[in-house]
């Protein structure tokens, strides 16, 4: 959840919103200090258990939009990227609905390639967008923020041109709302390079996660001056 930017935007657009957060303090701080509106359903708990439980309910609740946005950058909760968990989310999407999956990592590492491979194994129709263009020439690292939009249908989908109301007065939304830097032919790009991530079989990812965490740290060091990190 972080500070609640995404759920706040959904609520502002009149979308009935359910927010899932494992840490009650994160939800409390988002509400108290970052103005997360109260008119939403909050579920405090493990998303893996929550998704499993939602499939046992009757009638099963489905969602038009699902945002899968957890901290990654080498410390990702890998259980939230397993084929089993993503299958569970797929079954919660309403007909014609969409899921957006945010992942930050080094796209040259097996962990990132395997996350993409696993997502594409579940959803038949995905479009992938990088935060920054592919570096030229390619170096030893390719750390970027990645958003994967997927649907359960096979029809081509596009993004409409945003209007002023979509930005909610935010310069950041104005700059980033329209997806850019699409990775074309993503299935062909990762084919044969990654493994399907399965529940209970994730130990092999640990080395890649450590390298990705180092890459994320180097990126964060460029966000603020050294003195800030040294003081912190």
Stretches with model-predicted labels:
Residues 125-232:
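Soluble small-group transferase modules, centered on the S-adenosyl donor enzyme superfamily
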Residues 1-100, 107-116, 120, 141:
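The AdoMet/dcAdoMet-binding core of the Class I SAM-like
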Residues 103-106, 130:
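E1/E1-like adenylate-forming module used to activate ubiquitin-like modifiers
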